Amino acid sequence: MSDQVIIFDTTLRDGEQALSASLTVKEKLQIAFALERLGVDVIEAGFPISSPGDFESVRTIAKHIKNSRICALSRAVTKDIDVAADALKVAEAFRIHTFISTSTVHVQDKLRRSYDDVVEMGVKAVQRARKYTDDVEFSCEDAGRTPIDNLCRMVEAAINAGANTINIPDTVGYTIPGEFGGIIQTLFNRVPNIDKAIISVHCHDDLGMSVANSIAAVQAGARQVEGTINGIGERAGNCSLEEIAMILQTRSEYLGVHTSLKNDEIHRTSKLVSQLCNMPIQSNKAIVGANAFSHSSGIHQDGMLKNKNTYEIMTPESIGLKNKALNLTSRSGRAAVKSHMDSMGYKAEEYNLDTLYADFVKLADRKGQVFDYDLEALMHFANLRDEDDFYKLNYLSVQSGSVMATTSIKLLCGDEEKCEAAVGNGPVDALYQCIYKLTGYEIVLDKFDLTAKGEGEDGLGQADIIANYKGRKYHGTGLATDIIEASGQALLHVINSIHRADQIAEIKQNKITTV
């Protein structure tokens, strides 16, 4: 049996199900590039049949990612599988992941089929997927609550049909480690063709057991672990891949396995996912939380000063947690910025150098010394902006007293510059009133967050909002050294997304009318 554990990331599919507002194709591609840098073996890019947006995301990621295998999910339905293959075909090699429910409650109450029918559907799905690729994964949904005899039968049939990865999900996070490890061990003992497939696990965190269950499965012989960055996902979330990575590294001698991950990319990847998904990381989160490497107890601090190994089982550097000052000023050239981006592992296709450099110069003029996290934040935010944004903030002035604030703005609306002033309960409220008046959009804010993206008083501030417009949710983000400006950028991000959606709807309607 191999001692390498394959890492299967489903942040862009299962993880996205936890978000209030869907990620854009650009945002998903950014995350995919980060996962590729991290060394993830398989990236589950989406569920193509679910929406045109998901189809386009999978297709785009399959086109651009070269060093990780791209996978798409499909039900055990012919059309699902065909659409998944169509989205993936631009990749040099790809995986189709098809699934069907196998637990008694799912088979009887959801599918309303006999178990014989379910086995036949699973077999046909695998055979259909094999027409497109020799890399097929089959999942037994709710395997954790499936009678073991039925599970063994389904696994054997799927392998005979051509599945070379068999996934055993604890879909509702019901099992505990000894129990789940026992399920995996039983499959190895009772399924005669088990040696022809890699056994994978996909554990949810409803009882807080997802990581522990995954490790128990690895000890029992599983050689693929599925999960998400920061453990994001439906309900209580998924198995946290950064925790799996550091467990397998820190306890490698005991467990006897390893991964191909570049663990020093963990912090950067975690931060990006948190930022784009607008999901803050709890401070005491293992591995990537703000307090993960903090020591406040006097006894602990004394021990750390004498020998870090007294209270530190891994180093901050092992996950890439380090801040290096850039020796760049506003007088530095593009080549210097590009050289530093290269040293951080970013490819030229991941950012526009001219845009990044222009933003860098503005920031350097404001705060002087620029750090890695500043440059990365500028890059990620620049990637969210579109050159064809209809609304652009040209000027902002704020006068604020103890109670009310007055804001004046100049907003570029297409080719026309418009001016507006408004009074509000604070500068952000006044700014938003100006923008509402000039754009005419009636938007309901569901969530508004401000977070620091650097250190010190002159650091960057990020504004994240979730807005509701005509029953649809939109996510907007803004970044600036001034939090009021960042707040305005976040709202304009939303309004430009709405404007583009309205334009597309109008074009579609005109086509229908013409026909």
From Swiss-Prot:
Reactions this protein catalyses: 3-methyl-2-oxobutanoate + acetyl-CoA + H2O = (2S)-2-isopropylmalate + CoA + H(+)
GO biological process, one term: L-leucine biosynthetic process
Family: Belongs to the alpha-IPM synthase/homocitrate synthase family. LeuA type 1 subfamily.
The protein's role, per its UniProt record: Catalyzes the condensation of the acetyl group of acetyl-CoA with 3-methyl-2-oxobutanoate (2-ketoisovalerate) to form 3-carboxy-3-hydroxy-4-methylpentanoate (2-isopropylmalate).
Residues holding Mn(2+): D14, H202, H204, N238
Occurrences of domain Pyruvate carboxyltransferase (ranges): 5-267
Tagged with keyword Heme: no
Annotated gene: leuA
Organism: Aliivibrio salmonicida (strain LFI1238) (Vibrio salmonicida (strain LFI1238))
Region (Regulatory domain): 392-515
Subcellular location: Cytoplasm
Class of the enzyme per the UniProt entry, highest EC level: transferase
Domain of life: Bacteria
Cofactor section: Mn(2+)
SUPFAM superfamilies from the UniProt entry: 2-isopropylmalate synthase LeuA, allosteric (dimerisation) domain, Aldolase
MF terms in GO: 2-isopropylmalate synthase activity; acetyl-CoA C-acetyltransferase activity; manganese ion binding
Keywords: Amino-acid biosynthesis, Branched-chain amino acid biosynthesis, Cytoplasm, Leucine biosynthesis, Manganese, Metal-binding, Transferase
Cited Pfam families: HCS_D2, HMGL-like, LeuA_dimer
Pathway: Amino-acid biosynthesis; L-leucine biosynthesis; L-leucine from 3-methyl-2-oxobutanoate: step 1/4
Protein name per UniProt: 2-isopropylmalate synthase
InterPro entries: 2-IPM_HCS-like, 2-isopropylmalate_synth_dimer, AIPM/Hcit_synth_CS, Aldolase_TIM, LeuA/HCS_post-cat, LeuA_allosteric_dom_sf, LeuA_bact_synth, PYR_CT
